C-alpha cells in the first residue's frame, strides 16, 4: 500500500486528488493547519495531520512513514487583488512550505521515494508568444518569479536520492470549484465578454486529467523532472468563451478593453486576465499519457452537463 502525504489537500485540486487517491486504495494523510476545516472538506477515511508549519521534528516523524509527498501548499493566486501584502503572502506561503518539507526530509532516516512539487505555467511568463514545452526558459512577471522560487524550495531533496517531479499546471477546469464556475457565470447571465482582443493563448486541463496525470507520475517510477499539466490543445481566449457559450446556448457580445484590465493593481490584469500562454504537455505525451479530455469542447460539455 503506497502511503501519500499531501500538503494543500483542502484546496480545489487537493480535495479532488485526495478523494481519487482514497478511492484507488492509497493511504492518504492530509497536512493542515486547521483540523476542523480539513475534516469538513475531506473524506472521513483521510488521516488528518495538524501541523503549525514550525515543528520540523514532528513533520519528520510523519515523513518517515511516507512513500510519496505531494506539495500543493500555497495561498490562492486569484482570490484577491494583488496588493503588495497579498503578493508577499502568495510567495511566502509557497516558499516556507517547500523549505520546511525539505528540512523535515533531511531529518528522516527512512526517506520518501518521491516528491511531487506543485508549480504553474506562469513560470513561462504572461506572454509566451509561441508554444512552450518543458524546455522553455523562465519568462517575466510576478508569477514567473513565484513559481521559480516555489520549484527551488524543494530542489535540495534531489541530493538525498529522492525522485522529484515538478508539475507546472495550467488553468484547471472543474465544476466543484476553481476558475471554471467563475468564467462561465457571466455567460450564463448573458453578460459574457471577451477580455481584450481575445487572441490570448488559454492553456487549460480538465480536473480529471490533472489528477490522472499526478497518479501517472506516481505509478511510473522512471518519471522525474518537469511536466506541463495542460491539455494538448490550448485555444484562444475567445474560443474558450465561444465554446462555453455554445454549450449554454448563450451569446458572448461584450468586450472589456485591455486598457481597463491593465488598471488592476499589481499587474494582475496582464498576468491573470490577459495572459497569453501557449503551453504543450510534451513530457506527458512522450511517456504515452492518454488524456480523457484532450479537446476543449468535450471538457466543457462534460462539465456543464454534470
Residue map of PLM features:
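NAD(P)H-binding glycine-rich loop region in Rossmannoid oxidoreductase-like domains
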Residues: 43-97
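Conserved Rossmann-fold NAD(P)-dependent oxidoreductase catalytic core, especially the SDR/UDP-sugar
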Residues: 99-141
Amino acid at each position: 500500500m503506497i502511503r501519500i502525504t499531501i500538503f494543500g489537500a483542502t484546496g480545489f485540486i487537493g480535495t479532488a486528488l485526495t478523494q481519487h487517491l482514497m478511492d484507488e486504495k492509497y493511504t492518504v494523510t492530509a497536512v493542515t493547519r486547521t483540523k476542523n476545516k480539513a475534516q469538513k472538506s475531506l473524506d472521513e477515511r483521510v488521516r488528518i495531520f495538524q501541523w503549525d508549519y514550525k515543528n520540523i521534528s514532528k513533520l519528520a516523524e510523519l515523513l518517515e512513514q511516507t512513500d510519496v509527498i505531494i506539495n500543493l501548499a500555497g495561498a490562492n493566486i486569484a482570490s484577491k487583488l494583488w496588493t503588495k501584502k497579498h503578493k508577499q503572502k502568495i510567495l511566502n506561503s509557497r516558499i516556507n512550505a517547500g523549505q520546511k518539507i525539505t528540512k523535515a526530509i533531511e531529518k528522516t532516516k527512512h526517506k520518501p521515494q518521491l516528491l511531487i512539487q506543485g508549480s504553474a505555467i506562469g513560470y513561462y511568463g504572461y506572454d509566451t508568444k509561441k508554444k512552450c514545452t518543458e524546455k522553455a526558459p523562465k519568462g517575466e512577471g510576478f508569477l514567473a518569479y513565484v513559481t521559480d522560487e516555489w520549484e527551488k524550495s524543494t530542489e535540495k531533496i534531489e541530493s538525498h536520492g529522492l525522485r522529484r517531479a515538478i508539475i507546472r499546471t495550467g488553468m484547471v477546469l472543474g465544476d466543484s470549484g476553481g476558475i471554471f464556475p467563475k468564467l462561465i457565470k457571466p455567460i450564463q447571465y448573458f453578460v459574457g465578454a471577451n477580455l481584450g482582443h481575445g487572441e490570448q493563448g488559454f492553456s487549460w486541463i480538465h480536473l480529471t486529467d490533472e489528477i490522472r496525470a499526478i497518479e501517472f507520475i506516481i505509478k511510473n517510477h522512471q518519471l522525474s523532472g518537469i511536466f506541463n499539466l495542460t491539455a494538448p490543445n490550448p485555444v484562444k481566449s475567445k474560443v474558450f468563451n465561444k465554446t462555453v457559450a455554445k454549450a449554454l446556448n448563450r451569446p458572448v457580445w461584450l468586450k472589456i478593453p485591455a486598457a481597463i484590465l491593465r488598471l488592476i493593481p499589481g499587474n494582475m490584469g496582464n498576468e491573470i486576465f490577459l495572459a497569453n500562454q501557449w503551453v504543450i504537455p510534451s513530457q506527458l505525451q512522450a511517456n504515452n499519457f492518454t488524456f480523457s479530455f484532450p479537446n476543449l469542447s468535450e471538457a466543457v460539455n462534460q462539465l456543464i452537463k454534470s
